[in-house]
Amino acid sequence: MHEHAYRALNSSELMAYRDQKIKESDCKMRRIKNSATLSALQICTFLFLSLATAAAAEPKAPSSLTNIFAPESTPAKSIFNLSMFVFAITGIIFVVVSTLLIYAVVKFRGKAADSGREPAQVYGSTQIELAWTIIPVLIVVVLFLATARVIHAIQDAPKPATALEVTVIGHQFWWEFRYPKLGIVTANELHIPVSDPAHPTPTFLKLLSADTDHSFWVPQLGGKTDLIPNRVNEMWMDPHRPGLFLGQCAQYCGVQHAKMLLRVSVDKADDFDAWVSSQRQPTTDNEAVIAGKRVFETTACINCHTISGTAGNGHFGPDLTHLMSRRTIASGAAENTDEKLRLWIRNPDAIKPGSLMPAMQLSEPDVDALVRYLETLR
């Protein structure tokens, strides 16, 4: 009798324990459902805001940030449209899979009435297995064809006779721009003309590296393209409006990779012609700053830098012939002002830690004279 009571008591406890676990399971499933719903809402909200931001981007305003949502050239627009196409397909896949997952979790969750009953066993479905094989294959084929089409259109574009040719050389940690047909060499700030669709004047870039791997990337004007030692890569862009576009090195290249910035100034035809004319002007001797020129020619400056009309013919650092025509120094790390220029000469690491430019051990009078001289190089 006592044994039967003990067994009955154990059976009651087990039933109570099982009911408790089922309730806990139901609560857990509700939490999962709520969490999944919240996550889906957050993702949808983020995507909506991202697309709304892209749609609301003001195309006529000067660019101030690197922006992948406001393409301003044919290659960039092709890449953007492909990205949105892939995003739409993957978004649909995400919604379908998430919906089915949530439905299955909610519909077939464990209930108190299911206790002790084995769920229905399914041993395969030819239709479902064909569907989840054929549909993914078709999706991959569509994505492959769309991507191949864009790659072909960008990489195999013909070069018209009106195209501007620029050689881009990546250095640690600055950019060199050479215009072979114009006889111009500058640094960090690329000037190119706007391309009128009626009379296209695209810019074709030949990309080289002087030391290690770099990557040229101006998001609004084109995809990133690597600069690799002993290899020539090419890319092109045809900006549709004038303005300032920011870019940067997109391949880790050393300590100051993050500050290897670049600026692309897209000029109207007349403005670009004026810039070319000013860059072709030789430097002139100015008696008021002859002392600064002497400092440049008698110190280590000439080992790295070139200034037309002086003994300086170095190529390790940027060409300074028209230094003051640039808005920034140190590859965009600082504005090109008197104060920043003095600091850059005295202690480059204060502006760009890890820079390969050494601190010039100059007296204050020599720094003053050198800065006054450099400020005449326009």
Predicted regions and their residues:
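Non-transmembrane, membrane-proximal soluble domains of secreted or membrane proteins
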Residues: 57-85, 105-315, 330-346, 351-353, ...
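Alpha-helical transmembrane segments
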Residues: 94-110
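N-terminal secretory/membrane targeting signals
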Residues: 6, 10, 14-17, 24, ...
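Alpha-helical transmembrane segments and their helix-start/interface "positive-inside/aromatic belt" motifs
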Residues: 30-43, 82-87, 129-134
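Short, solvent-exposed mixed-charge patches
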Residues: 377-378
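Hydrophobic alpha-helical membrane-insertion segments
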Residues: 41-52, 94, 135-141, 145
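Hydrophobic single transmembrane helices highlighted by the model
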Residues: 78-98
